[in-house]
Amino acid sequence: MIRLICGLQRPTSGSYRLYGSENTDKKILEAQRRIGAVVETPSIYLDMTAEENMKEQYYVLGLPSFEGIPQTLKLVGLEDAGKKKAKDFSLGMRQRLGIAIALAGKPDLLVLDEPTNGLDPQGIVEMRELILKLNRERQITVLISSHILDELSRLATHYGFIDKGTIVKEITAEELENTCRKCVKLQVTDTAVLAHILDKRGLEYEILSDTQANVYGELVVSDVALELAEQNCRM
């Protein structure tokens, strides 16, 4: 999916839309120019410095001036890399250089494929902070492909789930959190009585019908059952 929207691969079937343009429309190329991406491994020249790598990308994009390079390198935390060659960078530094290169064209959308893969704990924290910074300070939308759900939960506002090349579900972070909450479904003879008991205990719940309710959080079922029985309500 990522390779398709970045124009690195053609679809064998199906379609996609970017900024209102179908993939079969000639305007799709204009839409793809609004995207910066780091797909799989960063595309960098190992025998060049961070600044030299950036200049190469500026040449490729036909940008008239190198003025933005120092600012971009500072943004990703590579302003002090100096004359150090990329081959001597840590994995985290290479990832950040890849992002700097992807930012050269001032994209609206940044696509990152497994950006924390292989990084040590400190590198993961730095990558997370950088992604949040790009979103908050430059208003760049970031599309992340990752299997590390715990890390995604610290970043994502929306999730998309893909199965065999098809997006099967899209959901907000809040909706996902609610879906994944611990929940006990209770069936009773009177949910009005159950609601009164749960309110006293300060528990969150959802009444599904006259006889069924979902209860969220830590629940001692035996205690609730005893209290229900005292009020002639069976569970």
Please state what every model-predicted region is:
Residues 6:
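Helix-to-loop junction immediately C-terminal to a conserved catalytic motif
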Residues 55, 64-81:
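Conserved ABC ATPase "signature" region
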Residues 128-214:
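ABC transporter nucleotide-binding domain
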Residues 110-114:
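Catalytic Walker B motif of ABC-type/P-loop ATPase nucleotide-binding domains
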Residues 14-24, 30-31:
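Conserved ABC transporter NBD signature motif
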Residues 106:
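Conserved catalytic motifs of ABC-family nucleotide-binding domains
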